[in-house]
Amino acid sequence: DKELGFYPFITQDGKYLVLYVAKGTDPRNNIYYRKIADENGDFIKLFNKMEASYNFVFNEETTFFFVTDNDAPNKRIIAVDIRKPEKKNWQEMLSEISDPIQRVEFINHHFLVEYSHNVHSQLKIFDSAGNFVKEIKLPT
């Protein structure tokens, strides 16, 4: 398909090559991966139905963390063990709220989440289990 765009990146631990696949300007995407050490290996499908957007945040061994709008129009953070990737095995790390998630970073074992609240950005920090830690006040 000529409209498919392929965006490869390597996980922060250097163990996996992840392939983000999108079609045109559609925000929904597919995710494939393979171990870096397996140079001739095939990509493994993780999300391949173009049913939602999945944006990789980080991984801990075989658990990949994503921001997704799957069943959450304002987005949520999920953990997916690539050894058991079925939806029933997903762990929700941060539930969807009324304010949409704009961006997520994982720094020093904490999620830094930017929300859009009444057309203004809010920054909140959550621990690695998804528990609220604090809000960072932004300049006005």
Could you tell me what each predicted segment is?
Residues 1-140:
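Peripheral, non-catalytic segments that deliver or gate enzyme domains
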